[in-house]
Amino acid sequence: MKQKCVLIITDGIGYNKNSKFNAFEAAKKPSYEKLFKEVPNSLLKTSGLAVGLPEGQMGNSEVGHMCIGSGRIIYQNLVRINKAIKNKELEKNENLQKLLAKCKRVHIIGLYSDGGVHSMDTHFKAMLEICAKNGNEVFAHAITDGRDVSPKSGLNFIKDLKGFCENLGVHFATLCGRFYSMDRDKRWDRVKEYYECLLGKAYKVPNLLEYLQKSYDENITDEFIKATQNENYKGMREEDGIIFINFRNDRMKQLVEVLNSKDFKEFEREKVFENLLTMSVYDDKFKLPVLFEKEKIENTLAQVISKAGLSQLHTAETEKYAHVTFFFNGGKEELLENETRVLISSPKVKTYDEKPQMSAFEVCDAVKKGIEKGEDFIVVNFANGDMVGHTGDFNAAIKAVEAVDTCLGEIVECAKKHDYAFIITSDHGNCEAMQDEKGNLLTNHTTFDVFVFVQASGVSKIKANMGLSNIAASVLKILDLEIPKEMNEALF
């Protein structure tokens, strides 16, 4: 069977039997149509227990790529934190107790929704309660979502948080959309607005809930809420403690850098803070205490390929680069031997409905160059279905799928020419459900299955009831490498 192999991850494209407001179904996609006719294909599970999340919880890019790259189901931080709260282990956490003993005033920062991709509202509330009951003065800094949940669901979430804070005697200090506070593409002007808000130098209002409603009246949805503070909030002090409740790292790293790094030079800062505590490891370069340490994941797909002396290329545009490197490699940043990484810059637009093709064609070129060079294994992510799906723009999402389809056609042709096997799948769905039955925009991921296509010598059928954790072993089987005991079985 030995062949070189390309693994193509079409982010945010899933299978929805309902064709209404389904951008995948509505798109012109000759490459996909050809794949369905000519290549063995099936459906894979990408949500809930199949990827180590709670039952019914939608999958996400971090979890999906971890599952694909490690070849096993890893119980995610969301599940670990839920257990720690239920068993009252969180309040006994040594690093948390140290911070609460050292700092009288404590700030809780995080995305406040039940999306479960970056955070959970229940984790935010549990942390507020632990800190308040300990006798600390506590400040809540809520980041509104509108992306992993519906665009105006923030009103109910923030109403809930406001009441919770009042009952606990906690200060509801600031409000800001994730567009500003959770940027991951080095748009430092956005993060600066939030930094200044945390310091007490933003627009002041008497009631943050009323401000949110006023923003809706001006057609500003949750993701884009401008950084605003309660008029009674005076800002962070350098001796204060700061706790970040997001368990996913990629959209918190920049904010932590701004608040904590002594070497930061992107803009002038008035204060730098030392007493930070993060829910999980955001970046190995941050020498900060964490609540939930990383679980060690050994014998990942990339490690096995590297140890065998084979070459590999990992490529994506900025928005998904961390997913085909850090997450795919089991939460490790360091470059492996014979591993090449190619980062293609994402377009500098406010939201990707402005440019639905994003940088897909440049990413496609990088893959074709890798095939022509003779890389033994290539993994690539096309971000379009997910990133454009998140905008809620149905027509733009159709164009996004069509751009991916064009790229698939070119890569498949190139792979066949150079006798490469290929596997095509998605980490989760999104753009196949852009509105609900009532006509409300859906910008979040779905819990639908995703397609998988396998073109490799000797493969005529894919086993039933498979998931993302079965892909790594499939790649190793194609490369004719031994499958480690930690991995789940192959797809064929």
UniProtKB/Swiss-Prot annotation:
- Cited SUPFAM superfamilies: 2,3-Bisphosphoglycerate-independent phosphoglycerate mutase, substrate-binding domain, Alkaline phosphatase-like
InterPro entries to which the protein is assigned, alphabetical: Alkaline_phosphatase_core_sf, BPG-indep_PGM_N, Metalloenzyme, PGAM_B_sf, Pgm_bpd_ind
Q: Which organism is it from?
A: Campylobacter jejuni subsp. doylei (strain ATCC BAA-1458 / RM4099 / 269.97)
Q: What EC identifiers does the entry list?
A: 5.4.2.12
Name assigned to this protein: 2,3-bisphosphoglycerate-independent phosphoglycerate mutase
Q: What domain of life is recorded for the organism?
A: Bacteria
Q: A GO term (biological process) for this protein?
A: glycolytic process
This entry's comment on the bound cofactor is: Binds 2 manganese ions per subunit.
Under the cellular component aspect of Gene Ontology, which terms does the record hold?
Answer: cytosol
Whether Metal-binding counts among this entry's keywords is yes
Q: Where is the active site?
A: 61 (phosphoserine intermediate)
Q: Where does Mn(2+) 2 bind?
A: 11, 61, 427-428
Family note: Belongs to the BPG-independent phosphoglycerate mutase family.
Q: Which residues bind Mn(2+) 1?
A: 386, 390, 445
Keywords linked to the UniProt accession: Glycolysis, Isomerase, Manganese, Metal-binding
Q: Name one GO molecular function term.
A: manganese ion binding
Q: Would the keyword Mitochondrion turn up in this protein's UniProt record?
A: no
Q: How does it assemble?
A: Monomer.
Q: Tell me what reaction this enzyme catalyses.
A: (2R)-2-phosphoglycerate = (2R)-3-phosphoglycerate
